[in-house]
């Protein structure tokens, strides 16, 4: 499989030329991080000024909710940190870092979720989310939806409300969308798992 199996999920988010250019920057790495996994590396997008501009503009054009419907953007560690703050700044919103366990000083809110082999925990600082603050959760990829659903639980446990989700890439066939419930949702690119 190659870039030719990647397609734009929201055609209104970018021109065909921009979509082709953005997709051309995504590397497909077979058998990484382990055998049988087809890894989509979009780190080259961040090294390319045109690619980064296309990505940010497309994310804004494809927002699943109007900017008046959320107060802040929350990004998941690690790649959600790469575009989440830039997206938040362009929209005039604050940014909330959702970290892996043990990376933040106490007190924190924490939420654990199941992985294929074990479990993981996400955390946010105790003061990151204001009561009833409406949060747009962003991440680079949705596969099974486990980490995104845990991020929702984490935001809600801190007193916030999830306004919606936005992802750069969506792996088809893993049913990640189901884990998100009825929240507004968007992804820029789709590809087979």
Curated annotation (Swiss-Prot):
It catalyses: AMP + diphosphate = 5-phospho-alpha-D-ribose 1-diphosphate + adenine. Keywords: Cytoplasm, Glycosyltransferase, Purine salvage, Transferase. It is found in: Cytoplasm. It comes from the Bacteria. SUPFAM superfamilies: PRTase-like. CDD domains: PRTases_typeI. GO terms for biological process: adenine salvage; AMP salvage; purine ribonucleoside salvage. Catalyzes a salvage reaction resulting in the formation of AMP, that is energically less costly than de novo synthesis. PROSITE patterns: PUR_PYR_PR_TRANSFER. GO terms for cellular component: cytoplasm. Its EC number is 2.4.2.7. This is Adenine phosphoribosyltransferase. InterPro entries: Ade_phspho_trans, PRibTrfase_dom, PRTase-like, UPRTase/APRTase. Pfam families: Pribosyltran. One of its GO terms (molecular function) is adenine binding. It is an enzyme of class 2 (transferase). Belongs to the purine/pyrimidine phosphoribosyltransferase family. Pathway: Purine metabolism; AMP biosynthesis via salvage pathway; AMP from adenine: step 1/1. Homodimer.
